[in-house]
A protein has these predicted regions:
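Extracellular lectin-like interaction modules
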Residues: 1-262
Length: 262
């Protein structure tokens, strides 16, 4: 195994494993492709460098254990295109830090992705900080890290299709800054873990729009700030308040807001 690895060009296998165990610096744009079969793409260390990285894994999984963006990437796309790229995505590390962006735009998954995207590791704080839009598309999302925070500066954060499941310590924060372009869209339900503890949900969109489905299952406080809020489902807390701080549109019929004390 190398102590460090520079990548400046594409890497392609015919359905074979791509296993990179050294810290990676991108010195050129790169497309990492493991074919249409079950070849996993596994980065066991960090990824940095001001370039574009595109990963396509077929039916194999994409596993990135280390942090991304010590030097911010220009963009990160994982299984963004191609009907055959349906493998799950596991990001154990962070994208950037709580104070510095780790990349420009991020696009994980696409409409044909039938599996899941998992963020974080148990006991480790989760930060996903970018200077561009964050677009995620999968049938389900698992947030495993401590207090995952998705942050942009006036850019959108979108979770398409599936619902979000929050682990016991995964208090969710999405903060898109103070401008109008930082919309927050979550098409699936947000749910905690049924273990008797509660997790909080904080959505801060500045003047941007917020559109969410339902929130429930061991959820604590729910706070939503934005330039207009659209509810496509009900919100239920098991031990906290519901605080919505802007004009709200009920997009469907019977929507209820229920706290633990009624």
């Amino acid at each position: 195994n190398a102590s460090a690895l520079n990548i400046a060009a594409n890497i392609t296998t015919a359905d074979g494993l791509i296993d990179i165990n050294a810290p990676v610096t991108l010195t050129g744009d790169a497309v990492i492709t493991s074919g249409t079969g079950g070849g996993n793409v596994d980065f066991s260390s960090t990824i940095s460098g001001g370039q574009n990285l595109d990963i396509l894994s077929g039916t194999g999984n994409v596993i990135i254990t280390g942090d991304i963006g010590g030097t911010a990437l220009t963009s990160l796309d994982i299984n963004k295109t191609g009907a055959g790229n349906t493998g799950s995505i596991f990001l154990s590390g962070n994208i950037g830090t709580d104070s510095a962006a780790g990349e420009g735009a991020v696009n994980l998954g696409h409409d044909g992705l039938t599996l899941s995207i998992t963020f974080g590791s148990t006991g480790v704080a989760g930060d996903y900080n970018t200077t561009g839009d964050q677009i995620y598309e999968a049938d389900s999302y698992v947030l495993s890290g401590t207090d995952p925070t998705f942050a942009t500066v006036d850019d959108a954060v979108t979770f398409n299709d599936g619902g979000l499941t929050l682990a016991t310590a995964s208090n969710l924060t999405i903060n898109t800054g103070s401008g109008t372009a930082g919309a927050i869209t979550i098409q699936g339900d947000i749910a905690g873990t049924s273990d008797g503890s509660t997790t909080t949900v904080t959505l801060e969109a500045g003047s941007g729009a917020v559109a969410i489905k339902g929130i429930g299952t061991d959820i604590g406080n729910v706070t939503i700030d934005g330039g207009g809020v659209t509810l496509n489902g009900s919100i239920t807390t098991a031990g906290g308040n519901i605080d919505i701080n802007d004009a709200t549109t009920l997009a469907t019929g019977a929507i209820t807001l229920t706290t633990a004390n009624g």
